[in-house]
């Protein structure tokens, strides 16, 4: 079973990702992880932190000479601002006099609407939102991207699967509804200021961000992740927790600020008749083919051989420059919410994080299906399965003769 967990706070010494259950022999380097983390910092509308934040990656265990060893993989991402926060975020007790002299340690008692501040303070008994926001911060997603980088390397090397994303819409801009991009389009997408696949959509998104920035506001949006090259049969119909669509939705909804997930055409299919909602099948030269992909590559909780399409809706960032009304938890008085350094829009970066979570779930499903202790063994199992599937589809291929 592939498992992952992260640790660390936004302004702590470092973030840590631990990935357990990865097979031996997968090629991965700290440079690969750094490149994906750099993609996470992309995007028009990011805040000042992105201009000086550098992700200092150290692979602590589970990899030797660029190959995974089969044991738990630990990745550390150092915080380059740690010297500024060393006293405030120290793990050992600190002299109260030192803390009293630090402006960074001022109590944060005015929770931000839409953030974890309020519920977290009440649930854990904190008088200050600092312990909540430090862990709830989207900075934690850097560790998820690190783990996801290893998963996507496994998917590429074991199955030839590619995972990519693009931004569909930002704020009220009209959503892009054209054909999804392919792996060859990813450099151009990453070169786009908003990681858009369509140039006209890109300009509309930039205009929305500029307007929100001028008004002291923030924006959300929608990203789409596409996974290409998946075999038929990852996931299962046998029980709800084995359904791949449920696993994907849970993983993506677990990302900070994500408020909605759909697979394929998702909610649009609810407004269609059945004859216009499903993907009809026909005999093809290599087996069954389809002319549409409304299901987004999943039927009955299993991959069906079509490209996987997952969309995620991100809410506007909770730290609004114009400051929203709240209650000071120390006094009970009306107040304006605390303001932490933040972005106007982080939707382009969210696409990279959703890629990582989709890759992790797909890698787990592939290892559950094909097993193996080494990449070579997993590949042998995959090859045997694909041959068996091709034999089962042979009658459909003969139907086109």
Curated annotation (Swiss-Prot):
Necessary cofactors: FMNH2
Cofactor: binding details: Reduced FMN (FMNH(2)).
CC terms in the record's Gene Ontology section: cytosol
Encoding gene, per UniProt annotation: aroC
Gene Ontology biological-process annotations: amino acid biosynthetic process; aromatic amino acid family biosynthetic process; chorismate biosynthetic process
Lineage, top ranks: Bacteria, Bacillati, Actinomycetota, Actinomycetes, Mycobacteriales
Positions of NADP(+) binding: 40, 46
UniProt keyword annotation of NAD present: no
UniProt-recorded Gene Ontology molecular function terms: chorismate synthase activity; FMN binding
Described function: This reaction introduces a second double bond into the aromatic ring system.
Keyword set, alphabetical order: Amino-acid biosynthesis, Aromatic amino acid biosynthesis, FAD, Flavoprotein, FMN, Lyase, NADP
UniProt similarity note: Belongs to the chorismate synthase family.
Top-tier EC class: lyase
Domain of life: Bacteria
Quaternary structure, from the entry: Homotetramer.
Pathway(s) where this gene product acts: Metabolic intermediate biosynthesis; chorismate biosynthesis; chorismate from D-erythrose 4-phosphate and phosphoenolpyruvate: step 7/7
Pfam families: Chorismate_synt
Reactions the enzyme catalyzes: 5-O-(1-carboxyvinyl)-3-phosphoshikimate = chorismate + phosphate
Binding site for FMN: 135-137, 256-257, 300, 315-319, 341
Protein's recorded name: Chorismate synthase
EC number: 4.2.3.5
């Amino acid at each position: 079973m592939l498992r992952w967990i992260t640790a660390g706070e936004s302004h702590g010494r470092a973030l840590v990702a631990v990935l357990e259950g990865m097979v031996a022999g997968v090629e991965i380097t700290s440079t690969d992880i750094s490149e994906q983390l750099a993609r996470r910092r992309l995007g028009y509308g990011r805040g000042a932190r992105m201009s000086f934040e550098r992700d200092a990656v150290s692979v602590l265990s589970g990899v030797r000479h660029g190959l995974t060893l089969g044991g738990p993989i630990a990745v550390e991402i150092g915080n380059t601002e740690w010297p500024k926060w060393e006293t405030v975020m120290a793990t050992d007790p600190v002299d109260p006099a030192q803390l009293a002299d630090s402006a960074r340690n001022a109590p944060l008692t005015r929770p931000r609407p839409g953030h974890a501040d309020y519920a977290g303070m009440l649930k854990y008994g904190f008088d200050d939102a600092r312990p909540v926001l430090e862990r709830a911060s989207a900075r934690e997603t850097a560790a998820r991207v690190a783990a996801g980088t290893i998963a996507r390397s496994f998917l590429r090397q074991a199955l030839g699967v590619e995972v990519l994303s693009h931004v569909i819409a930002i704020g009220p801009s009209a959503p892009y509804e054209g054909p999804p991009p392919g792996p060859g389009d990813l450099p151009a997408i990453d070169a786009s200021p908003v990681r858009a696949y369509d140039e006209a959509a890109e300009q509309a998104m930039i205009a929305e961000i500029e307007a929100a920035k001028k008004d002291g506001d923030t924006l959300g949006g929608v990203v789409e992740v596409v996974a290409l090259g998946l075999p038929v049969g990852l996931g299962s119909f046998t029980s709800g927790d084995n359904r791949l669509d449920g696993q994907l939705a849970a993983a993506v909804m677990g990302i900070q600020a994500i408020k909605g997930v759909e697979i394929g055409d998702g909610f649009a299919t609810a407004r269609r008749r059945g004859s216009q909602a499903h993907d009809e099948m026909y005999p093809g030269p290599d087996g069954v083919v389809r002319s549409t992909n409304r299901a987004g590559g999943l039927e009955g909780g299993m991959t069906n051989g079509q490209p996987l399409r997952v969309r995620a809706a991100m809410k506007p960032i909770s730290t609004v420059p114009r400051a929203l009304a709240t209650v000071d938890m120390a006094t009970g008085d009306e107040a304006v919410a605390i303001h932490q350094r933040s972005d106007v829009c982080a939707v382009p970066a969210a696409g990279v994080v959703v890629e990582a979570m989709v890759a992790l779930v797909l890698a787990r499903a592939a290892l559950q299906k094909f097993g193996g202790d080494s990449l070579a063994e997993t590949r042998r199992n995959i090859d045997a399965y694909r041959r068996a599937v091709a034999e089962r589809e042979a009658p459909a291929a003969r139907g086109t003769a």
